[in-house]
């Protein structure tokens, strides 16, 4: 059984047996229209003298709505390994992580509304390795032959299979994604 203690306004320490992790304590502050969670994005790196610098600190400037889902694109890197130091704000120009020809990583937050506001997200498959954490709410991760209910604190590693998302609950589900383009051996065989 896991146990979580609030250690600050922005984080919680959760432990399950021997494993511990820090999960965000989502404040759930809403945007001015009341629909979405207000997010803060901080980006740091080093200057040419090796001193820490803040490249960005504020709300994400790259937000889109797709099928009723709000996607806040926080960062992307082209190619692997990523290049350091960071010199420009790659979050402002981050595109769709699933676009043809993109190779690299993408970091974003998706908000999927629940209840009657929940749109149908079609079954789809991406050629990516996706790491996800559910920050708030509940969501059904639907595979062609089964459904897995995920809730705040759950994580998922999704490896290029057919899936969709369904939010049957009243609360908006807040998901954090790190997407890595993958070499799909099945497609190239």
Predicted regions mapped to residue ranges:
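N-terminal secretory signal peptides and thylakoid transit peptides that target proteins
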Residues: 2-19
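Short, conserved beta-strand element in jelly-roll/cupin
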Residues: 126-140
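Conserved short histidine dyad/triad with adjacent acidic residue
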Residues: 108-126, 160-161
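A short, N-terminal "cap"/entry segment at the start of jelly-roll beta-barrel domains
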Residues: 9, 25-113
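Double-stranded beta-helix
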Residues: 32-45, 52-55, 166-189
């Amino acid at each position: 059984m896991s146990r979580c203690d609030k250690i600050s306004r922005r984080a919680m320490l959760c432990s399950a047996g021997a494993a511990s992790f820090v999960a965000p304590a989502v404040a759930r502050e809403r945007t001015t229209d009341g629909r979405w969670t207000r997010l803060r994005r901080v980006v740091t790196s080093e200057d040419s003298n090796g001193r820490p610098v803040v490249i960005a600190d504020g709300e994400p400037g790259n937000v889109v709505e797709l099928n009723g889902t709000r996607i806040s694109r926080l960062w992307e890197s082209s190619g692997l390994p990523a290049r350091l130091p960071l010199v420009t704000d790659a979050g402002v120009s981050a595109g769709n992580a699933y676009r043809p020809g993109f190779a690299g990583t993408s970091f974003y937050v998706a908000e999927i509304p629940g209840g009657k506001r929940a749109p149908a997200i079609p079954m789809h498959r991406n050629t990516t390795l996706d790491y996800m954490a559910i920050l708030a709410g509940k969501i059904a991760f639907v595979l062609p032959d089964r459904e897995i209910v995920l809730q705040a604190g759950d994580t998922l590693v999704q490896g290029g299979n057919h899936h969709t998302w369904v939010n049957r609950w009243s609360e908006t589900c807040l998901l954090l994604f790190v997407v890595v383009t993958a070499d799909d051996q099945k497609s190239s065989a």
